[in-house]
Amino acid sequence: MEKKYISIGKEEIAYLDEGAGDVVLMVHGNMSSSVHYEPLITRLKDKYRCIALDLRGFGDSSYNNRFDTLDELADDVALFIDALELGPVYLVGWSNGGGVSLKLCAKYPDKVLKFFDIEGAGLKGYPVYQKENYQSTGKPYASKEDMAQDPIQVLPAIKCFEKGDFATMTAIWDATIYTVNKPTREQNELWMAETLKQRNLVDLDWALANLNMSDEYTPYGLGDGSIHNIKCPVALTMADKDIVVPTYMVMDNYNALGALAILLPYENCGHSPMVDCPDKLAKDVDEFFSR
């Protein structure tokens, strides 16, 4: 699969575009890119036009402007949809891409027909708290600069990116993402090369920590209530061996979305159903979008 490029505003977005039919737009997670969707694209492209983009600062997309919120990335996706004249799309989001997609659904309801959320970020964000003796204090960071020095969740990954440390990044993924199955050697080499292209980790971690679409407070502040602006049907996967996005985050999303949402429990599956159960995932995506 070869990437194409299109300009949106001040950024150039790289993307994969495979197959024909109704458009399925795929939004990737943190430490990844469009290429991580290849197992799903391969299984869906005979029926759908599968488009997966590299978000700003990921993969081969530009990073001309920093960002503070997932709203800004959702705005990029909306501009991308318009630039390619896609019309309303079937949307897939994975991990952080689930958070970006929730924002897209809330801000641009006319652009999304249905949303399939794969182990997506919770509507109350993914907190990174201050540390004392390498233990979380539950206190929020006051700035990106302070968060960048977090000795557990942020700084080690920054050093991996700076060094292009393939071995350490692979070990991180093996320990946290691939908790059930492992990718092939060829897949891992390709996907890790894409992972190491990320340049925006601090922006992304800050945006995720501050995400709050609920009506409630988190240590980072009061939510904006934007979850109530979502109008489309949403399917949520809930994998029993995911140690990145815990079950309570998926349930928070499910409960907040009410009658719009359906819950899809995945047994013996970790944070990447694309690796742990790609056939089941593709079947569920197709059935949900075909209803």
Segment roles from a protein language model:
Residues 259-291:
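Catalytic active-site module of serine/aspartate enzymes centered on a nucleophile-bearing elbow/loop
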Residues 71-89:
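Conserved acidic catalytic loop of the alpha/beta-hydrolase fold
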Residues 115-160:
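Flexible "cap/lid" loop of the alpha/beta hydrolase fold
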Residues 216-217, 241-245:
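Acidic catalytic loop of the alpha/beta-hydrolase fold
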Residues 11-66, 80:
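Conserved HGGG/HGGXW glycine-rich cap/lid loop of the alpha/beta-hydrolase fold
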Residues 230, 236-238:
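Short beta-strand/loop motif that positions the catalytic acidic residue
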Residues 155-229:
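Conserved alpha/beta-hydrolase catalytic His-Asp/Glu region
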Residues 87-134:
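Conserved hydrolase catalytic core segment
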